């Protein structure tokens, strides 16, 4: 496969990156998700990429940039549901109904999309009774516990298998963006922080940490692009295998790189003021979305 970006893809990447830098600096990201966030991204065309004729490979490029900025919100659901559900959608993957559900961004959404075993169902949020968690894992992702999630109605035009695959790939692209951002943040700090009258980045132990982190991010990026290409053209390869591999590698890269960035920052890495903790908490959370690392590893092994 040939993964060099075309001129159009580079323009897409640069455009989304400029939007993220302009509209979603760290201070804005820390405020969390609101309707304005969704509207701002909608204006850029992020959610309508597939509907507008772009490929899944193009969409992963956009989501990598969103991940680099750790933009909050039910972004993947915005792409999957575009043109099918009005307002702000959120969702969850629940192949075995009946158990209590954890729903992200319930208060800000208009509808919850539920991926059941054989269909996508839509449930209006005004029909849902949920209890917001006081201390969610990711402070930028509010979560509500729903004891009895209504069945909802089947969403016409939604292929549940394709949604699961696409959702996993877009989430993996977001994770790759976070993995690269962690490398960049840790490298910048290692070049700036001095000990023994020299940058700490000059020490071999730090160099090895950062080199390993970069390798993880690049390997994951390649896997994600390969999975996106198979979504666009299933004849290229085994779609399920590519998706499982991409989500597994991207999740590992995001989590391990966030931990590495925390370590390189030393004591500062554990403070609220340093942005690294935002990536670490989001990385933990995203490893529970569209399949856990264990579920993807088991699928690959089988």
Mark where each language-model region is.
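Alpha-helical interface subdomain recognition
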Residues: 1-69, 163, 168-302
């Amino acid at each position: 496969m040939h993964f060099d970006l075309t001129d159009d893809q580079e323009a897409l990447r640069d455009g989304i990156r400029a939007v993220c830098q302009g509209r979603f600096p760290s201070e804005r990201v820390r405020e969390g998700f609101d309707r304005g966030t969704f509207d701002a991204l909608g204006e850029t065309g992020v959610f309508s990429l597939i509907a507008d004729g772009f490929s899944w490979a193009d969409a992963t490029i956009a989501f990598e940039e969103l991940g680099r900025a750790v933009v909050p919100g039910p972004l993947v659901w915005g792409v999957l549901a575009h043109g099918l559900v009005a307002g702000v959608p959120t969702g969850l993957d629940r192949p075995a109904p009946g158990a209590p559900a954890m729903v992200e961004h319930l208060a800000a959404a208009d509808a919850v999309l539920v991926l059941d075993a054989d269909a996508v169902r839509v449930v209006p949020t005004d029909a849902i009774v949920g209890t917001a968690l006081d201390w969610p894992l990711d402070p930028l992702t509010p979560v509500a516990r729903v004891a009895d999630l209504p069945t909802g109605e089947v969403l016409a035009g939604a292929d549940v298998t394709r949604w699961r695959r696409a959702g996993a790939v877009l989430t993996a692209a977001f994770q790759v963006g976070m993995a690269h951002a962690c490398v960049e943040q840790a490298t910048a700090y290692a070049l700036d922080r001095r000990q023994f009258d020299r940058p700490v980045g000059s020490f071999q132990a730090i160099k090895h940490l950062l080199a390993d982190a970069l390798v993880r991010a690049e390997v994951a990026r390649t896997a994600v692009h390969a999975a996106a290409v198979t979504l666009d053209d299933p004849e290229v390869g085994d779609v399920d295998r590519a998706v499982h591999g991409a989500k597994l590698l991207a999740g590992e890269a995001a989590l391990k790189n966030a931990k590495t960035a925390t370590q390189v920052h030393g004591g500062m890495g554990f403070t609220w003021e340093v942005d690294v903790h935002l990536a670490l908490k989001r990385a933990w959370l995203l490893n529970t979305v569209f399949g856990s690392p264990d579920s993807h590893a088991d699928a690959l092994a089988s």
